């Protein structure tokens, strides 16, 4: 049985060799696709670079609308200004630098947006919103009377690419207290509230606002402060009703102890002279009383000096007929 199986195994092995040889031949005969590589171009045949466009100034017409080119304040643009502008001081003697890439032209402010044509267009556009100046306001006194509040603000021009300045937001409001409807109590209280913002010499109250980032906001805030101060000055607190003469901000002659004492003294002197026809109103209107009043008020409200003391001394002598 083993002898019969041996020839069968040999025949199977020879067939396997024939099949393996056939498959190898078929595989070698079939072409294998290889990945294609991009073809290299020589160095002198590179694709051309993109050409830079010509500046805008070469395409501008002579009769173009210039306010459309520079409508607002902006830094200098060399590609938009058709002028051979040069600026700078070269180290070696020569021609100043051209406008292309010139930093000196960017530093300084320009007024290319404020040409005569642009100003004329602005005026024509604003005519519909403007009215004629009132004919009755023909003097500064009348303007101050009808418009007592004065608003000051400043626009800055600085050397730099930015047209903004943080100090331009500051607003200063000025008004004379005499133009406001205030009585004696309200005026003194308002002066006490504002402190150093009030100038006694010129009678002007100055309010400066710079807390807000915009000028309009600072203007509204200044008007708001003035409104609050005005209404608060008219309020009378309970403790204000109990103020005595020593608590007053300034000495007032009317109904003061000095007025009462001098009236009593003069009435006693007149009674001793048996002259009962003179009353208090006539005594207060005499020249001696007026001089004594001025000297006392000056001595109380102002600093004491030799001049005020001598005036007080002379007024007392004349009042009491003392030589």
Curated annotation (Swiss-Prot):
One of its GO terms (biological process) is mitochondrial translation. GO terms for cellular component: cytosol; mitochondrial inner membrane; mitochondrial small ribosomal subunit; mitochondrion. It is found in: Mitochondrion. The keyword Calcium does not apply. Residues 31-59 are annotated as: Disordered. Keywords: Coiled coil, Mitochondrion, Ribonucleoprotein, Ribosomal protein, Transit peptide. One of its GO terms (molecular function) is structural constituent of ribosome. Signal peptide: none annotated. Pfam families: MRP-S28. Component of the mitochondrial small ribosomal subunit (mt-SSU). Mature mammalian 55S mitochondrial ribosomes consist of a small (28S) and a large (39S) subunit. The 28S small subunit contains a 12S ribosomal RNA (12S mt-rRNA) and 30 different proteins. The 39S large subunit contains a 16S rRNA (16S mt-rRNA), a copy of mitochondrial valine transfer RNA (mt-tRNA(Val)), which plays an integral structural role, and 52 different proteins. Belongs to the mitochondrion-specific ribosomal protein mS35 family. This is Small ribosomal subunit protein mS35. It comes from Homo sapiens. The gene is MRPS35.
